[in-house]
Amino acid sequence: MANTNKRLAVIFGDVTLGLKGPDFHYLFSYQTGGPESLRIQGKEWLYRSPKPTFWRATTDNDRGNQFPLKSGMWLAADQFIACQSITVAIDGQTIPLPIAPENNRYSGRETAQEVTVTYTYQTITTPQTTVEVSYTIQASGKIRVAVTYHGQAGLPSLPVFGLRFVMPTPATRFIYQGLSGETYPDRMAGGIAGEYEVTGLPVTPYLVPQDCGVHMATDWVTIYRQAVLDNCLHEPVETGLKFKMVDQPFAFSCLPYTAEELENATHHSELPAPHRTVLNLLGAVRGVGGIDSWGSDVEVAYQIDATQDRHFEFEISF
């Protein structure tokens, strides 16, 4: 790997891979199984390493047709997932995983135009399957993310499939280009394509907290935050992080709670005060149904067949 004058500095740490440019510094962890820091223009955007997500908080219709009893293993898979392997490629060339002491071979002055880090996860379902998430970082700081689910015979229907980002503080607003309002695969006909702004992180006030706030057929979404956890920034300004489709639109939800937090609450008073932003970027979403709430399943066309492969990509930029 040549030491050329490129903008992307590559730092080979003992347990992390650092990538640095003029306005950003990223850390990809070999221990947590994902990126653990995306610091852009001095602001940290990650509170937890992004991980594949498979679960949504059950809806009234889900509970009525006993979907959680049929597909409950995906809740465990959403909470606990093992990173099976990690590969690193510098300018298209795969290198031995640069953990200690392998990283001692590098000078500390390496640079590259493009770096790809791929994490392979294994679910704790029965039977098991794998998910691959690759991050390709360019010298500009743009990150292209590819998420691949490998279908496996014998697995029950999925609630959702995507990648979950947890950000350190609540978003002030988000702007997206897609369909108006809350939409699901079987609730899209009334959505009007356009650009929309949502203030704060609204949660639909159902009697029992459940999944909400999904936006289908999205071209891009920009999350804006002002508050930070860094006490050195006394007057933080609002900045945004953009997530944009690559080949096909995605779905997303942007809430102050994880699916598990919503799932555990039986009334809104049981939900904690909002402290984080939970952004789910989704390549597949189960419909909500509604034929009735006491037994009828979601129509087959709006279910997610877990035996089939799934893949979607998006770009992160600032």
UniProtKB/Swiss-Prot annotation:
GO terms for biological process: lactose catabolic process. The keyword 4Fe-4S does not apply. It catalyses: Hydrolysis of terminal non-reducing beta-D-galactose residues in beta-D-galactosides. GO terms for cellular component: beta-galactosidase complex. One of its GO terms (molecular function) is beta-galactosidase activity. Its EC number is 3.2.1.23. InterPro entries: B-gal_small/dom_5, Bact_Beta-galactosidase, Gal_mutarotase_sf_dom, GH-type_carb-bd. SUPFAM superfamilies: Galactose mutarotase-like. It holds the Pfam family Bgal_small_N. Keywords: Glycosidase, Hydrolase. Belongs to the bacterial beta-galactosidase small subunit family. Heterodimer of a large (LacL) and a small subunit (LacM). Component of a beta-galactosidase. This is Beta-galactosidase small subunit. The gene is lacM.
